[in-house]
């Protein structure tokens, strides 16, 4: 029995080289009549009568930034997706860490609603609670059960997927017809995959084991051997450019003259910022700079294989006659930094370089060479894809909004001006033996004992964007109740925290606005503009010359 059944109306071009045999065939999608009785997908608006619903492909990179030029190596991806469709210049994640962000993509929810707060089982990352409560309601599960889509997953799922305490590799999340998932975190060699619930180990032979290429090959085989009677959804989650930054052999000498960008916030002290940022050592040591330059270069090298993957997918879709009826999304789970505010390498922070991601989309009804400045977040991916499939967002409890009208060029569109960013810091209860001078409660202290995280690196922000304003307001849940506010129109590199130069009364209103977002759920998160109907926020008041005033203490609101 084959992993993927051969469609009866397509000639076979040789047996699948990369898909294993011996796995049980998935059940067929529900018949159309049953879907209609269940109130399923009724067809995407604007589709030709009698035409099949569109296919969707989502390619998800791991730790790929937008601010520091993360899309530069992906020339083919930009040409085949961005230039053939729409590029979003204001795409954000609600949490700058892998597992919470990926959970937001799958559920369409903010972290305070899906309750995945970090990359551990204790933090609800692929835990039994996640499996029981959230997985049945992910957008792929809805596509499968309510819309009759074939659903295919390949690559990194969640950081703790495959943990023995949460079902191991035998656990296949609800909603996936074909499951080809990596055990735990990103690797390029010497990893284990769950193939429809059965473990398969890979070694370190480039020709058969390099994970990005394996994902490309199994995805191409799916396109050749799937059923042609139903639409499909594919999610391909690459390891690149996540550490350990192992490039394919043919790309290991690329970008030899490339270094981490020396932008205005590179290797400077984080003045007037949260203590975790202030503890970074400025200037960085030469060894730290050399380390992050090498990391930056190697990250780009790994992305060249992702570029090849995208090219292969597009060409195969075109060869199979399916490209014109397929939406292709390209994005990342979070951004990254390399030396900004003297933090060597990581994500997790509230600044643009960590929370802003690439987002490119092509598909039916999207004009080529479009750029949108509309404020979108990865919680919008699920609602948008369900909208494409014809499933109403109001049937879900998702926090995000469908940006399909933006893709189709809708005019006079009422849209949000704010998204929420929230993060719960991680620390260690013991002192790091490599950094004995540091107290317990910190983590990710490398190199030179510069820490990237701590228990009280717990914060929530409102990111505000409109035609006139470009703002960020953040609160930390710590003893200081520290506040950071940035006017990104005047200060795009977030050098100047203006929290102490703003009227305390206005800060109080902004605090209340943040708490409204942190307590939202489902439809109340989708309300455009200001979330408190009794309050009209005027950003112009922020930049009046109030002088230096003492900021009031805010009421804390935990994630």
From Swiss-Prot:
Ca(2+) binds at residues 62-63, 98, 333-334. Glycans are attached at residues 118, 124, 190, 205, 217, 286, 324, 369, 394, 412, 429, 456, 487. Residues 1-26 are annotated as: Disordered. It is found in: Lysosome. Residues 1-47 form the signal peptide. Its EC number is 3.1.6.14. The keyword Calcium applies. GO terms for cellular component: lysosome. Gene3D superfamilies: Alkaline Phosphatase, subunit A (3.40.720.10). The modification 3-oxoalanine (Cys) is found at residue 98. The modification Phosphoserine is found at residue 548. Processed by internal peptidase. The conversion to 3-oxoalanine (also known as C-formylglycine, FGly), of a serine or cysteine residue in prokaryotes and of a cysteine residue in eukaryotes, is critical for catalytic activity. SUPFAM superfamilies: Alkaline phosphatase-like. Belongs to the sulfatase family. This is N-acetylglucosamine-6-sulfatase. It comes from Capra hircus (Goat).
């Amino acid at each position: 029995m084959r992993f993927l059944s051969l469609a009866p109306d397509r000639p076979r071009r040789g047996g699948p080289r990369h898909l294993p045999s011996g796995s049980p065939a998935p059940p067929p999608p529900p018949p159309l009549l049953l879907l209609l009785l269940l109130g399923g997908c009724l067809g995407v608006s604007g589709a030709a009568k009698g035409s099949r619903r569109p296919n969707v492909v989502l390619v998800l990179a791991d730790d790929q930034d937008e601010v520091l030029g993360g899309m530069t190596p992906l020339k083919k991806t930009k040409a085949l997706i961005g230039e053939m469709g729409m590029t979003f210049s204001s795409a954000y994640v609600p949490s700058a860490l892998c597992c919470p962000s990926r959970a937001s993509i799958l559920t369409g929810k903010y972290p305070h609603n899906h309750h995945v707060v970090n990359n551990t089982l204790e933090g609800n990352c692929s835990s039994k609670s996640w499996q029981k409560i959230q997985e049945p309601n992910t957008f792929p599960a809805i596509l499968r059960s309510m819309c009759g889509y074939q659903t295919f997953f390949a690559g990194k799922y969640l950081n703790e997927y495959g943990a023995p305490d949460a079902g191991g590799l035998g656990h296949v999340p609800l909603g996936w017809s074909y499951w080809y998932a990596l055990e735990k975190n990103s690797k390029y060699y010497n990893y284990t995959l769950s193939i429809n619930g059965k473990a398969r180990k890979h070694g370190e032979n480039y020709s058969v084991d390099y994970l990005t290429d394996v994902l490309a090959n199994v995805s191409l085989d799916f396109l050749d051997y799937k059923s042609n009677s139903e639409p499909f959804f594919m999610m391909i989650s690459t390891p690149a450019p996540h550490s350990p930054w192992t490039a394919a052999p043919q790309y290991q000498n690329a970008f030899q003259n490339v270094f981490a960008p020396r932008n205005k916030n590179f290797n400077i002290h984080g003045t007037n910022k949260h203590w975790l940022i202030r503890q970074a050592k400025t200037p960085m040591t030469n060894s730290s700079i050399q380390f992050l330059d090498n990391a930056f270069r190697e990250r780009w090298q790994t992305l060249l294989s992702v570029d090849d993957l995208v090219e292969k997918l597009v060409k195969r879709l075109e060869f199979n006659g399916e490209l014109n009826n397929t939406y292709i999304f390209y994005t990342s789970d979070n951004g990254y930094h390399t030396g900004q505010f003297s933090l060597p390498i990581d994500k997790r922070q509230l600044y643009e370089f960590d929370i802003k991601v690439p987002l490119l989309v092509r598909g039916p009804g999207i004009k080529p060479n479009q750029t949108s400045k509309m404020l979108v977040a990865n919680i919008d991916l699920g609602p948008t894809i369900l909208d494409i499939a014809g499933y109403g967002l109001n049937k879900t409890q998702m926090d995000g909004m469908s940006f399909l009208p933006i893709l189709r060029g809708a005019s006079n569109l009422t849209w949000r001006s704010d998204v929420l960013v929230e993060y719960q810091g991680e620390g260690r209860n013991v002192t790091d033996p490599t950094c004995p001078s540091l107290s317990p409660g910190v983590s990710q202290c490398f190199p030179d004992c510069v820490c990237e995280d701590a228990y009280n690196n717990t914060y929530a922000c409102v990111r505000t964007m409109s035609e006139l304003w470009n703002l960020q307001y953040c609160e930390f849940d710590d003893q200081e109740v520290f506040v950071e506010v940035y006017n990104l129109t005047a200060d795009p590199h977030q050098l100047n925290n203006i929290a102490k130069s703003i009227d305390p009364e206005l800060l109080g209103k902004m605090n209340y606005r943040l708490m409204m977002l942190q307590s939202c759920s489902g439809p109340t998160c989708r309300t455009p503009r200001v979330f408190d109907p009794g309050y009209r926020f005027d950003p112009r008041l922020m930049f009046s010359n109030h002088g230096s005033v003492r900021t009031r203490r805010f009421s804390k609101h935990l994630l």
